[in-house]
Amino acid sequence: MRNSLRTLLLVLFCLVLIVGLGGGLFWGNLKFVRAVPAGVDFFGLWKPAQNLIMQGVMPYDQVNTLQVQRWVYGRAALAAEQSYQFNMPFYVILLVLPVGWIGDFAIARTLWMVALELVSVGLAGVALQLSGWRPSWFILLLAALFGLFWAPGALSILHGSLVLFQALLVFGAIRALAREADELAGAFLALGLMYISVTGLSILLIGIWVVSLRRWRVLAGFLMTLTVLGAISFLVSPSWFSDFFFSILRTWREHALPSTFTLLEGWFPGLGVQLGQAVRALAIIGLFFEWQAVRGKGTPWLFWTTGLTAVLTPYFGLRFSPVWLAFTLPAVLLVFSVMGQRWGLFGHLMAFITLAGVFIGLWVAELAVLESVFLFIYPLFMTIMLYWVRWWVTRPPRLWIDMIAQEN
């Protein structure tokens, strides 16, 4: 009887604590939302979802595009400006419908921000788990705070981007693969196809790895999830796939977002295109050899290669938003964790310096509007750092001292 009462009190205490923390988090975010007008990416999801519920307007309709443009610019977008055309699969809107029911944009955005903050913390936890490190609570807190407040993460939360959800799904799929939950991994990868320009290469890599190990249940989960989502989408909007295809084409013709090609053309007007092609060729060659090397290997090697792929994605020359670099958070934490695990006090010092350098450097670049840092310098720096720790990631610990290091 006494044990039952103690358990009941503990459960009640935990519930009160969760409700209190959740309420405080919601209230703090709501105050921030009312003071700082932003959330353009979320508005581009919320408004089509609301119009679908209230008026039956499909997400790809120009009515939605014009409403988002007027909210952003106060008018229709000019030819050189971002159009904010909805360019994701239809089922994304179905997943956003719960917040689409909320008529108050501030309340809806607040709930979305709280969800993104929790996703960011979860992503940091998944990254540390994949790195094989069991750090102290201080390190866990530091990693979570870094994920929340470094420039790409903070901006993705501020604007309401889906990229953090995408990162959690893709790297969560690798975690599921490590635990042999293959069908779940396939479902995660199917849901990770929302931002194809961000996640496409990483998902392709994981698909090649899965085929090399003949883990067909992953493909079964992937295809089953896509089939269910696609079927529901066709029931609601029979023409959604063609609308989605043409919206992608319209978006790719835009020139509002920067790319490595536009940066190099600005620096070297006569050689920019050739230099951009050379950078892309080097990225393709490097990833070709790494993708070949990871076939048949374990999930730690796959994690490292996926991090490298995410970091090098901007070098392929596609239009790329700096916010999307939040997808590379696990790569940063992988470098941080290897330094902390393998090199003792010196490693901890270098890990903190690296983390601080990335944090400060990207915020300086954001405040100074230095797009080249996000799309060129940061990927180069992270590529160097990933190769610096490659040997320790791809080779399992062989000595008892290495095993002890992973526990600390």
What are the residue ranges of the model-derived segments?
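Aromatic-enriched
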Residues: V335-N408
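Primarily membrane-embedded glycan-assembly and transfer machineries that use lipid-linked glycans
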Residues: M1-L184, W209-L329, L333-G340, V369-E371, ...
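Membrane-embedded alpha-helical segments of transport systems
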Residues: M194-V198, V228-I232, M350
